[in-house]
Amino acid sequence: MKRALLINLPKTDLMVPPAALGVLAGVCGENNVDYDFLDFNVGLDSKFEDEQWLIMDNWLTGVTDSCDTEFLSVISRCWKESVIDNIHKYDFICISVLSYWGLKIAMHLLSNLDFVNNKRNYKIIIGGSGCQNNIDGYAQGKKSLGEWLLENMYVDHVVYGDGETTFAEILQESKQTLLKPTAQQDDLNSYPIPNYKGINFSDYKADAVFITGSRGCVRKCTFCDIETTWPVFRYRKAELIVEEIKKHYYDLGVERFEFTDSLINGSVSNFYKFNQLLAEEKAKNSDLKNISYVGQFIARPKQQMLPSHYEAMYYAGCKQITIGIESFSERVRNDMKKKFSNRDIDYHIKQCALWGISNIWLMIVGYPSESQEDHLDNIHGIKRYAPYAKTGVLEMIRWGTTLHYIDGTPLTRQHMLDRHQIYEPGNDSEIRPGSSYTWKSGINPDLTLRERIRRRLDLHKHTTKHRIPQARALEDLMILSRMAESA
């Protein structure tokens, strides 16, 4: 039987086993290929202290352009010990790059000549959203990571978009090197169920697994690149999601499920049906009584998400939802194409308070059109929603650092760059390729990096004053300190 090594590259957190590994294992099982798991994050975790993780974070996210040679050598040694020294055991080396933040480490590791030697008798396959991201700024030419890897013969196959069908073709000896889904016509309902058997759950902080109910998004937010990977929103039948939850519970004993969806209520009707079905299963079978789930969510008007929908979420076991509120300024959210109002936020949080569903709110500081008045709206929003933090309904806010431009997002399209007159200090004609924190706007000249950092620190002060917990606050402040050196 052929054998595959399934690898997840940094940086993903160590809360839950990576969804990509479960997906790949499910496809391997359907195609009679044995496999082993390797979450490279776990290997590095045993070698890095928190401060070293932050150094890597700054490098991967573009806060710093380079990484210390000694630091890179530690990463390379870990790669040699965990991958290269064992590579003779495998027919397929399958690597997942979750996002843009994996570009630099993928380029560093996959160009290792001991790994990609021309006499290799194994196939190197790479996939994940990060493969489609532009590497301009990290290598010569404007091309994607996948294209660069193929051109340099560092890999044998690159998979874009959904990997289930195309990965199966590779396992069946497809000769095609760059595989793309055909207009996303594959039916999510037909894909194999992810398989997490063999994962060492003790390596992770939460006894949980990921589950997928949909791919893509019903919104086209200007700062998000999800459309690049999945241009069409699709969802699975509610019945199949419930059956998968039951299977993982009985196979693995897990009771907590984390949705990978960009938003679990993308299809309101299917989400409502899922909650009803799961609640019915829990009522019938006491084994399932502790089943719970968390996921990303979008605030919707009352006429779309009725009170009965929140009630159904409660009985199905929804414990926490993460929402990209982004700004308490309705004007800024409209610029972002978020498509919900302050009234919708009020309705949503009141329903969550009624049913005990906690919220994590994600925010963006320094959107290109953000004015001082919009900043004051953010401060007023902190005060407005602080009472919900006292009850635990507003579990935490994450302000992040400040807005950065990332290739592949609508903000980096030429008409949007022209609209906001975006340029890089010291280079008036174009923005820094790759990822830019240091951009400036010709139509909003007061919104310098220094001013964005000031506003971010101001929001930290007010959030602390009103006793709203902040996610990763210390980490963000340390990054801001590093960014301030460029301001």
Where are these regions (language model features)?
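Flexible glycine/acidic-rich beta-alpha junction loops that bind and position SAM and/or redox cofactors
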Residues: 43-48, 131-136, 219, 268-269, ...
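Radical SAM enzyme core and accessory elements
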Residues: 2-9, 14, 23, 29-30, ...
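Radical SAM [4Fe-4S] cluster-binding motif and immediate context
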Residues: 190-359, 367, 380
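A structural motif corresponding to the C-terminal end of an alpha-helix
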Residues: 31-33, 153-154, 251-252, 285-287, ...
